[in-house]
């Protein structure tokens, strides 16, 4: 029997929820800073619009998990099951939105490298803003329809064909986004490392690659769990429980990691003295190879308000 603390909460469950709260608070702070700087202090280009929306999705995703863990540890009862389903639906929306934003960033970066002339001359000006709006609407629509047909409907309608179709779609959609993310990333890497198109890496490229790598390690397991859960839960009940909560903790780590990546890439090979968070973020999202001239220009920007 597992050792318990705080009444009936076992040590493993306590540690898991404490990890979610600790990582979540770090991520909340980091994503709030990123959103504040990108929203009010930096000029936004095509990629920064996606990163701004990614920070917003990560912020609210972490906030939902922190609230859920605190309520669990304090044993605060939920008012009713409808609110539980709504809360769960919101977290699905935010998870799918984050994955969609990352896939859009990778795809747009791939297009900017593979088709540079078209990208600079013929790409509509507000494509990034429009794509972000589409992503939010799609994520909301998919999650709300699934919640309506499978959770909010009368029990006698829960197992109907519409619910099953919706359930299959929401399980396979993250896998589709994962395939799109991988294909665009592989195409980008192939072009950058090929002899004809070989070019210097920018800090923005490094930032995107690190964010994708962290997502593949920490964010994607939950998507695979959703996809495989119909086969897992019927055969391995204990394994199903442990895999689910392990994947949830990993998604919290993933949402917490992006601001750390930005400030790590932005501060790499630069002295921390007299540097601001704005300068770190601006440097991490810089899309031009570093030269002595633009390094001097970046150092001068610290004098700006």
Swiss-Prot record:
CC per GO annotation: plasma membrane
Protein name, per record: Mas-related G-protein coupled receptor member A8
Residues in the Extracellular compartment per record: 1-17, 68-85, 151-172, 229-243
Alphabetically ordered keywords of this record: Cell membrane, G-protein coupled receptor, Glycoprotein, Membrane, Receptor, Transducer, Transmembrane, Transmembrane helix
Signal sequence extent: none
Similarity field: Belongs to the G-protein coupled receptor 1 family. Mas subfamily.
Gene3D superfamilies per UniProt: Rhodopsin 7-helix transmembrane proteins
Tissue localization of expression: Expressed in a subset of sensory neurons that includes nociceptors. Expressed in the subclass of non-peptidergic sensory neurons that are IB4(+) and VR1(-).
Location(s), subcellular: Cell membrane
Organism placement in taxonomy: Eukaryota, Metazoa, Chordata, Craniata, Vertebrata
Residues annotated as glycosylated: 151, 159
Name of the gene: Mrgpra8
Organism encoding this protein: Mus musculus (Mouse)
Bilayer-crossing regions: 18-38, 47-67, 86-106, 130-150, 173-193, 208-228, 244-264
